[in-house]
Structures are given as C-alpha cells and as structure tokens.
Amino acid sequence: MNDIDTITNAWGRWKTAQYGTTCWFTESTQYGRNKDTRSYMQHQTNVSAPKDLVYSNFVQQDGGSTLLGQYDMINEGSQVIELAVNLQQGLVDTFTWSVTEQLKVGVEVKVKANIPLVGGAEITSTVELSLSSTQGASTSKSSNYGASTKVLISPHSHGWGEVALSFTELRTQWVGNVGLQGYVAIWFNNKVALNNDGDYHYLWFIPVEQVFWECVQHNIVNTSGYVVQGNGVLAQATGTFHSSVGLNLKTIAHERPYPETSEAVRTFYNYASLVPDLETRVRSAE
C-alpha cells in the first residue's frame, strides 16, 4: 500500500501538468502541518476508524486435546442405563491478530477489535489494535468450559471411558476498513480556474474520492489498498487472526459383558460440538 502523500503528490504533478504548470504541494489528512492550509481545517480529509474488523470464513486445524473426565460403571440390570457425565474445566484460550498490510494515511488509526464468537464459552474481551503498524496484538482469556454428555451402558455390561476437550486452531483473514472523507488541497504554481468560470486561484480543494478515481482512471499511481466510494475512500488494513479454542467434546467409550467373558471389548467414539452453530456464528461476524 502506498502512503497517502505519495498518491496525492503523484496526482498533484499529473493534475497541474494538465494546466501547463507545476505543483507546490498537496495535503490531505494533515492540514495542520502546512501554514497554507491551517486556516482551512474544515476541508481536511478526515479519517474514521472502523468499529470492528471484518473477518473471512475460518480455516480449522486440529489443536490437540486435554482430558476432562473419566467414568466407570457396571450395569447388572436388564435395562440400558443412560449415564450423564457432567464436566467443567477452566482453561485459557489465546487470540492473536497479525497485521500484514498497515495503513499509511498520515495519522495513526486504532480499532477495538472484538474476539469473534468462535470459542467454547462466552467471550467478551476486546483488544486495541493499531492499524498503522505491523506490531499486531494478542490476548489470553480464561474460559470456564462446562458440558454434559450422555453415555449408554448396555444391560449386563461393564462400561468405562473418558471424555476429552478437543482444541481447534482457527485462522482467518481480516480487513479493517478506514473511511477517508473530505478534500485534498493542491497548490498550483500558477493560478488556474478549475471551474472554468474565470475564477483563478493557486489553492484548490478536490474531493478525496475524485483524486483517487482520477489516479485509477489515468493509471497515475498504484492505489491498491484503497477503495473509491461515492462519498469518500476506504483505506484497508489487512491481517490474519489466529486462536486456539476448545470446540468439541470427544468421548471414547469401552464396553464388555459383565460378568466378563471371552468376548472382545467394544469401543465407541462420539463427538459433540460445544458450538453447534459455529459456521453461522462465524459468518455473522462478517
């Protein structure tokens, strides 16, 4: 991403050449640093930080597991026993935001990034992330995982097993959309009448969206990372989000006749999501 000064200065050289003159300066988001634009702060290009980041769909990878509990029961009766295994465990989830393309709009922009709703417990933390550097941010959150799973013990059987919490490594891309609205100041080294009405001036103020539109239309300078809109421009910081969270319960159940016989042990596996509507919730965070 080119910084905004590089873009407006390239445009300024092109624009003034259309009128047979040269450009002294352009200003966009920092009118206060130039004595010739300090009196026109009302025209400055304003920078609006996003309320949150926009996340893409998540890619999941196995992140290992931890043992939550075990059970061991003998059913001497003639009816199936439904055993409820109640589990609760306090664990630490980690969340990391990396910035791969920072903003270069002349001023620092920060966002209060919410943790996407993808964990196995309610998560309400936010982290302050600068979109103007590649430093990134990370946070840890203690989560109290509680779950109940049901195990069936057949009649005249000995059942035992374990329940584990499977962790999932989640990765996704994010975008921070920063709004630019206002005007780019440009100083022509000879007076010109941009309005073609005989009104000649050195200093003119051009809507920032027109500046970027002309850069794209006339291939003046690379504007990747900026999106022209009807009433302004979006400057887009991008990066990746990574978290390690508990999402699934894995039950390994063993069963053999009771009293014991030579019959082989039967083993069953069962998986239960702690967030059954994970896909819907992830998409809603977009």
Curated annotation (Swiss-Prot):
Domain of life: Bacteria
Any single Gene Ontology cellular-component annotation: extracellular region
Family: Belongs to the aerolysin family.
Anything else known: This protein toxin may be one of the virulence factors because it shows strong cytotoxic effects on most eukaryotic cells, especially leukocytes.
Originating organism: Pseudomonas aeruginosa
Chain residues in the propeptide: 267-286
Keywords (A to Z) from UniProt: Secreted, Toxin, Virulence
Name the record gives this protein: Cytotoxin
Sample GO molecular function, one term: toxin activity
Pfam families: ETX_MTX2 (PF03318)
Encoding gene, per UniProt annotation: ctx
Compartments in which it is found: Secreted
InterPro entries assigned to the protein according to its UniProt record, in alphabetical order: Aerolysin-like
UniProt main location, coarse: secreted
Entry function: Cytotoxin is thought to form hydrophilic pores in cell membranes.
